[in-house]
């Protein structure tokens, strides 16, 4: 379970994403399936902590160490302040603070990287990305203030009825208004 843009990012690095079923009880990848799917070409195991559940990563860290695979954890849904800074054996721990996260900054992220050379390389790449302006952030703040206000049940019901009256596709209109990633090429700087 992840957003489709993650697969796009993986492919952009010349890698092939291989999805693995998760256990319905633990929302963790099934280790026995990983054992079946691993090959000499396997490079990275990406585990997403879903719905605020922090998956015990030690068995996956052991699996990655045994198979010489990087362990990357997506902590976007598991940020809990000082309670969890990522697993100590994860090679990369990613935390994002988008508008729909439980702990939001309306954007931005933190990456904890064990390997200092990899961290430096990532920092060098990040430096060429354009910096968002204060105006961009103000527009975003205004947009999500109104979305939050309009999500109040009494107003939401009226808005849905108005959208139907105007023959607007309710689902696609809401999706477009709350889109976390830009449309088009995600990897264009």
Give short role names for the model-derived ranges.
Residues 1-82:
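PLP-dependent aminotransferase-like
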Residues 41-43, 90-93:
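A generic secondary-structure signal marking the coil-to-beta-strand transition
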Residues 67, 89-90:
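A short helix-to-beta-strand connector/capping loop
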Residues 79-82, 92-107, 112-189:
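Active-site region of PLP-dependent enzymes
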Residues 84-87:
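Short glycine-biased active-site loop of nucleotidyltransferases that positions the nucleotide triphosphate
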